Design a protein with these regions (language model features):
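C-terminal transmembrane-helix exit sites in multi-pass transporters
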Residues: 96, 113-132, 254-273
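C-terminal-most transmembrane helix of multi-pass membrane proteins
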Residues: 2, 47, 150, 250-302
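Helix-helix packing/entry segments at the starts of transmembrane helices
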Residues: 45, 107-112, 179-189, 227-261
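Membrane-interface interhelical linkers
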Residues: 1-15, 51-81, 131, 188-219, ...
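Membrane-interface helix termini and inter-helical loops of multi-pass transporters
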Residues: 25-39, 66-69, 99-102, 144-145, ...
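Hydrophobic/aromatic residues within transmembrane alpha-helices
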Residues: 30, 42, 46, 81, ...
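Glycine-/small-residue-enriched transmembrane alpha-helix faces in small-molecule transporters
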Residues: 1-41, 142-174, 259, 297-302
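Hydrophobic alpha-helical transmembrane segments of multi-pass membrane transport proteins
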Residues: 14-22, 26, 81-98, 160-171, ...
């Protein structure tokens, strides 16, 4: 039974990160098809349709009462509101980067994000660090510094995504509510802003006035590919060890590199060297995690 659950969890988690990894191609297609429609309008549509998709998922799962409970709990809202702001910023920067041919910077940001989370854990939650952790972080920092040459300047997209999502993850760590319920509440908090933006600035030809059936379907699809992976993620988290989940999350940025190549971004020598430093840090981080997990089991057995 345990093996079946593990396979179920691994399959669900793989689907989740594969969808996230290939998302740049979807948003790139939206940009090409929608043409004159800008990042902000696509962002607003993504929020609205993601909210619809997540609400439908919660309805099917019978978790809507849990969602309404979130909005009645002031202590939970104090954490969910800043999480919503950070998620909004992450989505906006990500969409802008995809539309402006900077997918590789996104990939770099999501590679280092788990390491930034670890560093934040040491600072905020007083989690212990040993000399191996400092070596890993130093290697990653060198990679980021080197990326200023490969990307023609400071990789603001990389830094912004890594920091925002890391702080977001730190906030989520302090929450005990269901992951889909939590994310849905954060998206619902964005909906008024999205609706107000469309009503005030995008009712003409630069927005709703130019929406054909195809464009509308693409926007709806954007909501689906935002909400649906969360279902698979929640299944995976329930059936997989935390260490396996941590390793799986590197699927997404790896696939994003492929997306960048398909979209015409050049992986220059300078960029490759930067990625090599990051990959080295990631590999050492994973190996160290495996080693520490084995040591814990060994200590517990004694």
């Amino acid at each position: 039974m345990q093996t079946v659950n593990y396979r179920k969890g691994l399959g669900a988690m793989s689907v989740c990160f594969f969808v996230w990894g290939f998302q740049p191609l979807y948003w790139y297609m939206c940009t090409n098809v929608c043409g004159e429609i800008d990042t902000f309008f696509i962002m607003a549509c993504r929020i609205i349709w993601a909210a619809v998709a997540c609400l439908c998922i919660l309805k099917v799962q019978g978790k809507l009462p849990q969602l309404w409970a979130v909005f009645k709990d002031k202590q939970v809202l104090k954490r969910e509101m800043p999480a919503s702001v950070l998620l909004f910023g992450d989505w906006l920067v990500y969409l802008w980067a995809v539309q402006n041919g900077r997918v590789l910077e996104c990939s770099l940001g999501y590679y280092i994000q788990p390491l930034v989370v670890f560093a934040l854990g040491a600072v905020i939650f007083r989690e212990k660090m040993n000399w191996r952790h400092f070596v890993i972080i130093a290697i990653v920092v060198v990679g980021i510094v080197f990326s200023t040459s490969g990307f023609g300047g400071v990789p603001y997209v990389t830094i912004a995504l890594a920091l925002m999502f890391s702080i977001y993850a730190a906030i989520k760590k302090s929450l005990t509510i269901d992951s889909i319920v939590s994310t849905t509440s954060e998206i619902l908090m964005m909906v008024p802003v999205a609706l107000l933006f469309i009503l005030l600035f995008r009712m003409g030809d630069n927005g709703m006035g130019s929406m054909t059936v195809i464009k509308q379907l693409l926007m709806i699809g954007g909501g689906v590919i935002t909400g649906l992976p969360m279902v698979f993620y929640s299944i995976g988290v329930r059936h997989l060890p935390l260490m396996t989940t941590g390793i799986c999350q590197y699927i997404s940025p790896s696939l994003s590199i492929i997306c960048g190549a398909i979209m015409g971004e050049a992986l220059t020598r300078e960029k490759l060297v930067s990625f090599l430093f990051i990959w080295t840090g990631v590999i050492l981080y994973v190996l160290n995690t495996v080693y520490e997990e084995k040591q814990k089991k060994k200590t517990a057995a004694e």
